[in-house]
From Swiss-Prot:
Notes concerning its domains: Lacks the C-terminal regulatory region which is replaced by HisZ.
Organism of origin: Azotobacter vinelandii (strain DJ / ATCC BAA-1303)
Keyword annotations of the record: Amino-acid biosynthesis, ATP-binding, Cytoplasm, Glycosyltransferase, Histidine biosynthesis, Nucleotide-binding, Transferase
Catalytic activity, as annotated: 1-(5-phospho-beta-D-ribosyl)-ATP + diphosphate = 5-phospho-alpha-D-ribose 1-diphosphate + ATP
Subunit structure: Heteromultimer composed of HisG and HisZ subunits.
Stated name of the protein: ATP phosphoribosyltransferase
GO CC annotations on file: cytoplasm
Length: 211
């Protein structure tokens, strides 16, 4: 059995056409089904529907053989028990700092609100800056508006939500896209099969994004 972990939303919508190129098509529509384990047209391939932030955990610990996760999630997760063999070049966005338009630099320690705590710690440590990091799970844009934080670190797509709340994108931390990840043990045990899938997906990606 080959198990692939995916999260609902943009990544799922963009991944399914790529999997179809490899002959893997879910029997039920994952967006409409309440099931979290979705069978596919191949009897020995199934999809697991999990939270985006949990995809690396399922893959690293062997509950899934493969998965698709955003680079932002992988940067925050930082696990060592998985391979990242392929950039699928889907769900593209940017991980950036943002703050109030025209705001002056704070006199004391910078306060940064984000759900990407590990990324934030590494980013500011590399700059030699001491900051107070505030963990939030959503509505990041609110933090600078109510004085909770001076800046935020978040994923930025169009930037419209930032601008609508009087914020502006500032420093680029990373360019983000979704990656195929593979459990290390699975890669050894099912090498030929997984490598064939990787090669097929790579060809599908390259046909969409010719050099």
């Amino acid at each position: 059995m080959l198990t692939i972990a995916l999260s609902k939303g943009r990544i799922l919508d963009d991944t399914l056409p790529l999997l179809a190129k490899a002959g893997i098509v879910p029997i039920e529509n994952p967006d409409k089904s309440r099931k979290l384990i979705i069978p596919t047209c191949q009897e020995d391939v199934r999809l697991l529907i999990v939270r985006a932030t949990d995809v690396p955990t399922y893959v690293e610990n062997g509950a899934a053989d493969l998965g698709v996760a955003g680079k932002d999630v992988l940067m925050e997760y930082g696990g060592q028990g998985l391979y990242e063999p392929l950039d699928l070049k889907i769900a593209n966005c940017k991980l950036m700092t943002a703050g109030k338009v025209g705001a002056e630099a704070p006199r004391g320690r910078l306060r940064v609100a984000t759900k990407f705590v590990n990324v934030a710690k590494r980013y500011y440590a590399e700059q030699g800056r001491q900051v107070d990091i505030i963990k939030l799970y959503g509505s990041m844009e609110l933090a600078p508006l109510v004085g909770l934080a001076d800046k935020i670190i978040d994923v930025v797509d169009t930037g419209n939500t930032l601008r609508a709340n009087g914020l502006e994108p500032q420093e680029l931390i990373a360019t983000i896209s979704s990656r195929l990840i593979v459990n290390k043990a699975s890669m050894k045990m099912q090498h030929a099969r997984i490598q064939t899938l990787i090669d097929t997906l790579r060809a599908a990606v390259e046909s969409r994004h010719p050099a």
